[in-house]
Amino acid sequence: MMTKETIVAQATPIGRGGVGILRVSGPLATEVAKAVVDKELKPRMANYLPFKDEDGTILDQGIALYFKSPNSFTGEDVVEFQGHGGQVVLDLLLKRILQVKGVRLARPGEFSEQAFLNDKLDLAQAEAIADLINASSEQAARSALKSLQGEFSKKINQLVDSVIYLRTYVEAAIDFPDEEIDFLADGKIEGHLNDLIGQLDKVRSEAKQGSILREGMKVVIAGRPNAGKSSLLNALAGREAAIVTDIAGTTRDVLREHIHIDGMPLHIIDTAGLRDATDEVERIGITRAWNEIEQADRVILMLDSTDPDSKDLDQAKAEFLSKLPGNIPVTIVRNKSDLSGEKESIEEQEGFTVIRLSAQTQQGVSLLREHLKQSMGYQTGTEGGFLARRRHLEALEHAAEHLQIGRVQLTQFHAGELLAEELRIVQDYLGEITGKFTSDDLLGNIFSSFCIGK
C-alpha cells in the first residue's frame, strides 16, 4: 500500500553528535534529493556532496544515499542525508526539505508503519524495532533482534498454518457427513487438536519468558513477620529502602524497588508479614500482600532458619503454598544462616529451589541473584529467544482458551460446526500478533510509541 505522501524526520537523536541523519520516504524523495544536492542520485550509491539551501547557499556537506522502491526499509523511495551532527545544521537542512511542496514531518513511528503497510515487516517485527532500541540488557537486545529477524513471527505463522489445516479437515468432515468414515469421531481431529494445543502452550511459555526479558520480572517477597523480608529487599536493592526492626509487623504496606541484575530488569516487592492480624491497618497490608502475590511472576517465600521448631517451618510453608495459585513459581529462602549455622547454599528440594543465606550479612545473596537472573531467561551464550509484549501474551491466552472450548465441543458434544468456529476465532487472535487481523486503533497506539524517524 504505497502512500501518496512524502515524509521526513531526523533519524539520529536530537542534540549534538558526530553524524546527523535526515530520512525522507515517499514518491517525492528523488525530487527532494535533486532540490538539496542538485543531482540525480543512483540507487545504492554513496555520494559525497554539498547540501544546498533554496538560493544555492551551502548548508552542509555529507553523504546522500538513495534507495529505490521497493528495495528500501519502507518499501518506498527513500533518501538519506548524512551530515554533521550539529542540531542547528540539521534544523536548517530539515527546513530546506520541508520547502519542497508535498513533503511533511513524519509522525512518531511512521517509517516503521509504512514498512508494515508495504509488507516489508509484520507487526511483531515492527514492534521489535522499538524493543531493540529500548533493550536494557545484552540478552534483551539479542532477543529483540531475533524478533526483528522474524523468529517470533515464524512460530506464530506455523501455528496459523496448523489451525488452517485443522479447520480444513473439520469443515470437510462437516461438508461430507454421508461418508462411511465419521471423521469427527475417528480420533484424527482430536489428535491434531491436541498437537495444536501442545504447540501453542510451548509458544506461550517462550513468549512469557520473552515478556519478562522486555518488561522485567515481578518478584514478591512473602513470609511471616520477622522472617527478614525487608532486609532481603535492602540487600537486593543495595540501599536501605525498607525500615528494618526486631518488631514484628513493621512493614504494613507494599514497598517496591526496581533493580537490574546484569542489565536484566526486576521489580522487587516487599510485603507485610503473613499472619492472623488483629490490627486493622496490618490486616489491610496483608490483603494487599496477597493481591501482589497473586500477580507475581515469581514469589520468594522467606523462612526464618533460626526457628527451633522445624515442624513450624514446614507448616508455614504448607499453609502458604495451599493458598498460592498453582501456576506461580516459588523460590524458598531460608534466611538468617549467620545465626542458625546453616551453610550458604542452593539446592532443589521437592520441586522447589531452596536457598540458604543471610540477608543481614548478605552472605549467600549472590546465589539468589544468580538464581533470579537464570529464572528470567539469562543465557551466557549468544543464542536467545524472542521478545514478546503483553498484547502478544493476551492474544496467545485467548487463543488457548478457545482451543480448549473447541476440544470440549468436539469430545463432549461432537459439534463440528462449533469447533470450526472456535478455530476461526483462534486464527483471528494469532493474526492480531503479526498484524493479519488488527484494528486501526491498535496500529495507531503501537506506532505512536516509536521514536520519530523510525
Swiss-Prot record:
Sites where the protein binds Mg(2+): S230, T251
GO CC terms: cytosol
Record InterPro entries: G_TrmE, GTP-bd, GTP-bd_TrmE_N, GTPase_MnmE, MnmE_dom2, MnmE_helical, P-loop_NTPase, Small_GTP-bd
SUPFAM superfamilies: P-loop containing nucleoside triphosphate hydrolases, TrmE connector domain
Domain of life: Bacteria
Enzyme category, top tier: hydrolase
Domain TrmE-type G residue range list: 216-377
Keywords annotated in UniProt: Cytoplasm, GTP-binding, Hydrolase, Magnesium, Metal-binding, Nucleotide-binding, Potassium, tRNA processing
Cofactor, how bound (note): Binds 1 potassium ion per subunit.
Binding annotation for GTP: 226-231, 245-251, 270-273
Residues binding (6S)-5-formyl-5,6,7,8-tetrahydrofolate, per UniProt: R23, E80, K120, K454
Compartment list: Cytoplasm
Cited Gene3D superfamilies: P-loop containing nucleotide triphosphate hydrolases (3.40.50.300), Probable tRNA modification gtpase trme, domain 1 (3.30.1360.120), tRNA modification GTPase MnmE domain 2 (1.20.120.430)
EC number from the UniProt entry: 3.6.-.-
GO molecular function list: GTP binding; GTPase activity; metal ion binding
Any one biological process term the GO annotation gives: tRNA wobble uridine modification
Sites where the protein binds K(+): N226, T245, I247, T250
Cofactors demanded by this protein: K(+)
Function: Exhibits a very high intrinsic GTPase hydrolysis rate. Involved in the addition of a carboxymethylaminomethyl (cmnm) group at the wobble position (U34) of certain tRNAs, forming tRNA-cmnm(5)s(2)U34.
Assigned protein family: Belongs to the TRAFAC class TrmE-Era-EngA-EngB-Septin-like GTPase superfamily. TrmE GTPase family.
Assembly and binders: Homodimer. Heterotetramer of two MnmE and two MnmG subunits.
Listed name of the protein: tRNA modification GTPase MnmE
Protein source organism: Mannheimia succiniciproducens (strain KCTC 0769BP / MBEL55E)
